[in-house]
């Protein structure tokens, strides 16, 4: 875990709690995403690591973000600038979305298959995972022909390897032990 992630967590939690209270989770997500992209900009990054005062940095950052960030978002940016934490904005955004997904009981699931899956197969996988994980599931599908057949499903810490390659590897391990 990076230092910036540790630094970002309290800011993300504060932004999340405020957005939840005001019923503005999506709006805050968009604001933080925009501000994070500004912070990632090479020229802005040079400015962040330079010797500009916190007040001037906040002023510049708010001006660059313009109307994309409302008054409350600007206040967050000013507080982060005063504490020299604007470089952590991308991590704040990531942590915010993690909290948002947890709140909405949603999880991203990576489904890797040997061939393209049909809509019916995807719906079946999605419904079974929703039941097992007790969350809304967002499937991100990809094809890896080296699997030979079957699928690999990754959802957070859960990994289900039902691929032909995985089965062959497990069989090989069992025979060698």
Swiss-Prot record:
This is ATP synthase subunit delta. It is found in: Cell inner membrane. F-type ATPases have 2 components, F(1) - the catalytic core - and F(0) - the membrane proton channel. F(1) has five subunits: alpha(3), beta(3), gamma(1), delta(1), epsilon(1). F(0) has three main subunits: a(1), b(2) and c(10-14). The alpha and beta chains form an alternating ring which encloses part of the gamma chain. F(1) is attached to F(0) by a central stalk formed by the gamma and epsilon chains, while a peripheral stalk is formed by the delta and b chains. Keywords: ATP synthesis, Cell inner membrane, Cell membrane, CF(1), Hydrogen ion transport, Ion transport, Membrane, Transport. The lineage of its organism: Bacteria, Pseudomonadati, Pseudomonadota, Gammaproteobacteria, Vibrionales. F(1)F(0) ATP synthase produces ATP from ADP in the presence of a proton or sodium gradient. F-type ATPases consist of two structural domains, F(1) containing the extramembraneous catalytic core and F(0) containing the membrane proton channel, linked together by a central stalk and a peripheral stalk. During catalysis, ATP synthesis in the catalytic domain of F(1) is coupled via a rotary mechanism of the central stalk subunits to proton translocation. Gene3D superfamilies: N-terminal domain of the delta subunit of the F1F0-ATP synthase. It holds the Pfam family OSCP.
């Amino acid at each position: 875990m990076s230092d910036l992630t540790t630094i970002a967590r309290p800011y993300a939690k504060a932004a999340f709690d405020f957005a939840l209270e005001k019923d503005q989770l999506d709006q805050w997500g968009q604001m933080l995403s925009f501000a994070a992209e500004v912070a990632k900009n090479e020229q802005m990054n040079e400015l962040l690591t330079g010797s500009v005062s916190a007040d001037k940095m906040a002023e510049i950052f708010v001006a660059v973000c313009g109307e994309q960030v409302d008054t409350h978002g600007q206040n967050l940016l000013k507080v982060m600038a005063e504490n020299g934490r604007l470089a952590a904005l991308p991590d704040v955004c990531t942590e915010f979305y993690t909290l948002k997904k947890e709140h909405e009981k949603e999880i991203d699931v990576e489904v890797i298959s040997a061939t393209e899956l049909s809509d019916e197969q995807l719906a079946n996988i999605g419904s079974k995972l929703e039941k097992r994980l007790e969350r809304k599931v967002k499937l991100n599908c990809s094809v890896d022909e080296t699997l030979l057949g079957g699928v690999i499903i990754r959802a957070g810490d859960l990994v289900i390897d039902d691929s032909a390659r995985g089965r062959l590897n497990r069989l090989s391990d069992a025979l060698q032990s």
